[in-house]
Structure formats: C-alpha cells, structure tokens
Amino acid sequence: MSDESMAEIAKARRDWKTAHLEMYLRSKGAEGHIMDLRDIGGHQFTTQCLVKYIGRKSGKTIITPLIYGDMGGEVVICASKGGADHHPAWYLNIVAGKEVCFQIATQAYRATWREPAGSEREKVWEFMQGVFPPYTAYQASTKRQLPLVMMSPIEPVEIFK
C-alpha cells in the first residue's frame, strides 16, 4: 500500500475517532458507549469507554475513546494501535503519569491501573480477543507485545467535558 493511501486511511480514522469522542462528550455519555464495529471485524455491541490522562509532553488533559472489556470488576483496554510497531501515545502517557480516569456511558471514575503479567496476562489477552477479535490480527502484524491495561475504580468523578 502506498504512503498516500496509508495517510488517507490514518486521516479517516482520526476524523472518525474525533467525531465519536465529540458525540460521547456532547451527549454526556448517553451516546457512544456502544458501537457497531462489525464492518471492521468487531461485534455489533462493542463497548467503548473514555480514558482521561495528562499528556507526558504537553501537560494537557487528554481524553481518548477506547474499546474495553470488564473482567472481574476491572476495566481492560488494549494498547493495539491497529498493530503498529510502536505503542499508542495514550499508553505512553498513562505509563508516564500517576493518575487515570475513565468514563463508561454516564459514569466516570478516578482509577488505579496496572498491567497483568504471566498467566494472568494470558487469560486477560484471551478475554480481550473475544471482546474485539481484530486484536488477534493486530498482534500478528507486529513484533511488540500489545500492552493490556487494567483499571480499577477508586471513586466517582464528574463525567468528562
């Protein structure tokens, strides 16, 4: 695929993600939590959360919409970046920071986060492949291990704006 084609795909993806984030925020979480991602290999009822963190370089608050799964009361997200060979910025920012917040539909929380390891990671990875089947192909397309982040709510916070 040409660099020009890749640039067009990247722009379309950014435009789609921006529109989705704006809808989620504008509706105060009433819209945007459930998405039909069958056209890209996902499920009809794919769950999306918002993750809020501080940019490691900018120091600004950033909100990113991400697919998630709930595993044993922890919210699990995958730093896939579509199988790119480098980690997504949101993951690097979370790792560099201390605090993370997430919003699911109309509820938001301050949270702790961790990365599962060993046999727990294997179980969480299997679970996330069920949440969003394209993760399997994403992992196959890169040499890096796709990071998994598990967030545990600490206390409710205001929904994101």
Predicted regions and their residues:
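A short, polar/charged loop/turn motif at coil->beta-strand junctions and beta-hairpin connectors
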Residues: 42-45, 145
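Short, charged, solvent-exposed linker or helix-capping segments at domain edges/interfaces
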Residues: 125, 160-161
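Short, structured beta-strand-loop surface elements
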Residues: 3-4, 9-11, 80-135, 141-145, ...
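Short beta-strand-to-coil "C-cap" segments at the C-terminal boundary of structured domains/repeats
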Residues: 151-157
